[in-house]
């Protein structure tokens, strides 16, 4: 097999991967957030627009949920659980899909803080501003490495 054909096969497989995940049915996401957080609602909309089935749980304090999910050091304004993984903050749907395809031995993903330009922090009220940031893969011991860089 020549390199060109191999490249085409790899590209075709990569393009079909999101379709494969969707073919298995909608992925359920549970989100814990405070009742007044608008950017959390915008992130929930982003996830729904990308094919996830989202259930929200309004709580007064997301801290205990975050700690129980292994994300205490990577706080943002909401914590989600999807297929056994924690998703802390404004993580893009495509990174969650990649996580579900790769299935790493990890606690989950985190976008610490509230980075401008990330899903839910990208509405007109932010004036198109973007903050360079990383989505982190958080291991089960609390350590992390860059999963995807946004510059």
Would you name each region that the model predicts?
Residues 1-10:
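Bacterial N-terminal signal peptides that target proteins for export
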């Amino acid at each position: 097999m020549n390199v060109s054909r191999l490249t085409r096969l790899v590209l075709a497989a990569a393009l079909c991967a999101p379709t494969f995940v969707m073919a298995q049915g909608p992925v359920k996401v549970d989100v814990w957030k405070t009742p007044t957080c608008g950017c959390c609602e915008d992130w929930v909309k982003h996830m729904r627009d990308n094919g996830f089935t989202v259930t929200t749980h309004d709580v007064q304090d997301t801290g205990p949920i975050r700690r129980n999910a292994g994300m205490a050091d990577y706080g943002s304004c909401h914590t989600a659980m999807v297929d056994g993984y924690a998703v802390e903050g404004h993580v893009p749907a495509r990174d969650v899909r990649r996580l579900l395809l790769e299935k790493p031995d990890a606690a989950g993903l985190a976008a610490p803080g509230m980075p401008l330009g990330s899903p839910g922090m990208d509405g007109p009220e932010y004036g198109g501003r973007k903050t360079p940031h990383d989505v982190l893969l958080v291991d089960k011991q609390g350590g992390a490495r860059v999963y995807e860089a946004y510059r």
